[in-house]
């Protein structure tokens, strides 16, 4: 997330590491600043992790053995967040606080010039965009074989944004965009 935020113009990290402690059966975060908190964790054999916050809030995270980032929600300074596991094993976590300024900067960058969708189906997307400042149009579509991109009717080689998404460079002005997907090998 921090790399993506930087690519989108944020000057600060979107997720900042905050101190946490882990021992057998429970990991603890002492909240020192109001904000949204998340946690990444090492592998567990338990399929469920339980969050308990000192304000009385609780939450269960199922399929924990699959591994994902836990959304711990909003917490206030002075709160204590505990993450417990039923197998009574040590689960090392890395806790993060969301930097809202970095999130807002990234959001504004993404939202400042958007494509207006004119049609879509399971294999074709068309739209228009009026570009005020030349840059890259990034799609929330995975960069994989099979996609062909047309800008103003001309086939354009797609680029990759953040090692994951389809992106195409655009000049100032109005553009017609078309993406067509054909299953590779057909």
Where are the language model's segments positioned?
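Active-site-proximal, structured, solvent-exposed surfaces of multi-pass membrane proteins
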Residues: 1-186
């Amino acid at each position: 997330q921090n790399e993506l935020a930087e690519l989108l113009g944020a000057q600060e990290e979107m997720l900042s590491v905050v101190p946490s402690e882990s021992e057998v059966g429970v990991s603890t975060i002492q909240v020192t600043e109001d904000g949204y908190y998340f946690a990444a964790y090492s592998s567990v054999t338990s399929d469920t992790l339980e969050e308990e916050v000192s304000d009385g809030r609780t939450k269960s995270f199922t399929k924990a053995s699959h591994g994902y980032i836990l959304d711990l929600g909003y917490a206030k300074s002075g709160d204590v967040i505990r993450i417990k596991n039923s197998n009574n094993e040590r689960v090392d976590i890395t806790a993060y606080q969301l930097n809202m300024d970095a999130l807002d900067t990234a959001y504004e960058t993404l939202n400042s010039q958007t494509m207006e969708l004119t049609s879509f189906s399971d294999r074709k997307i068309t739209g228009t965009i009026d570009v005020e400042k030349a840059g890259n149009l990034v799609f929330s579509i995975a960069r994989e074989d099979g996609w062909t991109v047309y800008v103003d009717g001309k086939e354009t080689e797609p680029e990759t944004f953040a090692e994951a998404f389809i992106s195409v460079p655009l000049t100032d002005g109005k553009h017609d965009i078309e993406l067509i997907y054909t299953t590779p090998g057909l």
